[in-house]
Curated annotation (Swiss-Prot):
MF annotations from Gene Ontology: rRNA binding; structural constituent of ribosome
PROSITE patterns assigned: RIBOSOMAL_S5, S5_DSRBD
GO biological process terms held by the UniProt record: translation
Ribosomal protein recorded as keyword: yes
Signal peptide (UniProt feature, chain positions): none
Cellular compartments per GO CC: small ribosomal subunit
Domain notes: The N-terminal domain interacts with the head of the 30S subunit; the C-terminal domain interacts with the body and contacts protein S4. The interaction surface between S4 and S5 is involved in control of translational fidelity.
Pfam families assigned to the protein according to its UniProt record, in alphabetical order: Ribosomal_S5, Ribosomal_S5_C
Function summary: With S4 and S12 plays an important role in translational accuracy.
Start and end residues of each S5 DRBM domain: 11-74
Record-linked InterPro entries: Ribosomal_Su5_D2-typ_SF (IPR020568), Ribosomal_uS5 (IPR000851), Ribosomal_uS5_bac-type (IPR005712), Ribosomal_uS5_C (IPR005324), Ribosomal_uS5_N (IPR013810), Ribosomal_uS5_N_CS (IPR018192), Ribsml_uS5_D2-typ_fold_subgr (IPR014721)
UniProt similarity note: Belongs to the universal ribosomal protein uS5 family.
Official protein name in the record: Small ribosomal subunit protein uS5
Taxonomy of the source species: Bacteria, Bacillati, Bacillota, Bacilli, Bacillales
């Protein structure tokens, strides 16, 4: 039990959207709630999850559990990204550009949640195409997954960082 309590304190969670969905049946409509949640430790690990349930708190709980199972490690350089990158998912794309210290996180709603919980403090971003929250979150995480730091690139090329 103690281990599980430590896990919950390790991550910060942020609810991006809650949506009420309806199933039409013979007797009327049956409502359920979907939740999109982003979790991160503000130290380079971030993930997202979705949950669906009859009640909002239960949907959020399911989404948090799903998010913790799907964490991504984000390389950072002095609080920003190592290089410019565009993440894509479906018809949505998110352009992310490193920024000077003190700039802050310049990003729209769902993208901001992912970047802040990943521990990025200075970045410029622009959302293009589809602006559905789930697509924006997935596009942002796609971009963050494709980031490479200088050491990785040097190793791939068989050189040292100084070269």
């Amino acid at each position: 039990m103690a281990r599980r309590e430590e896990e919950t304190k390790e991550f910060e969670e942020r609810v991006v959207t809650i949506n009420r969905v309806a199933k039409v049946v013979k007797g009327g409509r049956r409502f359920r709630f979907t939740a999109l949640v982003v979790v991160g430790d503000k130290n380079g690990r971030v993930g997202f999850g979705t949950g669906k349930a009859q009640e909002v708190p239960e949907a959020i709980k399911k989404a948090v559990e799903a998010a913790k199972k799907d964490l991504v490690v984000v390389p950072r350089v002095e609080g920003t990204t190592p290089h410019t990158i565009t993440g894509r998912y479906g018809s949505g794309s998110v352009f992310m550009k490193p920024a000077a210290p003190g700039t802050g996180v310049i990003a729209g709603g769902p993208v901001r949640a992912v970047l802040e919980l990943a521990g990025i403090t200075d970045i410029l971003s622009k959302s293009l195409g589809s602006n559905t929250p789930i697509n924006m979150v997935r596009a942002t995480i796609d971009g963050l997954q494709n980031l490479k730091n200088a050491e990785d690139v040097a190793k791939l090329r068989g050189k040292t960082v100084e070269e």
